[in-house]
Amino acid sequence: MAIELLETSTKGTVPGTGFTKAHQLFRESVRRFIDQEINPYVDAWEEAEIFPAHDVFKKAGDLGLFGLSYPEEYGGTGADYWYNMALAEELARVNCGGIPMAMGVQSDMATPALNLYGSHELKKKFLEPAIRGDAVCSIAVTEAGGGSDVASIRTKADRDGDHYVINGNKMFITNGVQADWLCLLARTTPGTTYKGMSLIIVPTNTPGFSVSKKLKKLGNWASDTAELVFDNVRVPVANRIGEEGQGFIYQMQQFQNERLVSALGAAAGAEKMLKMTIEYCRGRKTFGKPLIENQWIYFKLTELLSEVEFLRQMCYHCGRIMDRGEDYTREASMAKLKAGRLVREVADICLQFHGGMGYMEEYPMARYFRDSRLLSIGAGADEIMLGIIAKFEGIAPPR
């Protein structure tokens, strides 16, 4: 099915974007998958604070959702990145934030560097099963003492012959409980700067690896998040992605895709909340008339819909820059910053307009409100985005 969707026809092209009729057919396939395989079970998975990743990912892999822009040689479809962008928008239809986040880790966070810089053997062993959905993977970068300061990581991988011996801890790792392998950023040479780090594939069945604990979160409950421990974990040097000491650079490169799809998903999710709120305000009557007839309410909803459209178009602009083969770090950082702030405002206003009903867990607004808070923290906090943008604009003070 996935191959059939990847036609190159330009009929039905959306002006100003890279979307074609083929992308629309792909969207419809994703919507059916969400309606049949995810949304009917979301409430139960949220209550359990975990979802069956191997089962869901296998079904997603059968549709080709994890290999859209990856080579056919490794099970991908070799499509343009607009398919990934379409997927990010459609996943906002999932009735929670955790499952789209978990899927995004698989497609846009844990595997891009492996695809670009990994050896053929490494791709066959780890990338191919991830694309098929036969393996769940995770990106293990963040540490408790570092957060967004990636250059400060302390987890180390010491060379011992043809192996690395890994020691350290990772924190707030999405898919960490269920992952079959990790894309780990570790320090392979001593120091405290970004130099000397490497990306290494670590199978989670390796002796010495353990999940210290599954973490409880404010939102995104269905997605498991874990603290990971590496106690003399031995993996072959052949598991290193690319050159030794280049891991930080590789990681920074794949952050841009992560930030772009996060911003696109936020725009689609914010629009979903606003449309839900509009329908609620049309049906809810106070003081003898529908809420939607209050000027403050329909003006505010209109303003936020405009802001969402601006964000969406900024993301599409990133796609056009990518099509030209140019760097879009500045624009992706702007989109990510705007997305985190806007989705929080939308969630807050929409909950307010729902009144007491919005505060009840039995109604989805409470979940969306909780889930929305993460975007200004994960994938680079707002403050990190501001720092990046300031450097591009030439207004950051010299270090």
Model-found features: residue ranges?
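A short core secondary-structure module
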Residues: D162-H163, N167-V211
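Short, surface-exposed charged micro-motifs
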Residues: R154-K156
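Short Gly/Pro-enriched turn/cap motifs at secondary-structure boundaries
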Residues: M103-G104, A130, G145-S148, F172-N175, ...
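Alpha-helical interface subdomain recognition
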Residues: M1-G97, G104-V105, Y117-L122, P129-D134, ...
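A short, Trp-centered hydrophobic/proline-enriched beta-strand micro-motif
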Residues: G133-V141, L185
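Flexible, glycine-rich active-site loops centered on histidine and acidic residues
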Residues: T111-Y117, I139, A151, G191
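Flexible, small-/acidic-enriched active-site or ligand-binding loops
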Residues: S152, N205-P236
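Short glycine/proline-enriched turns and hinge-like loops at secondary-structure junctions
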Residues: A79-D80, D149-A151, N175-D180, T193-G196, ...
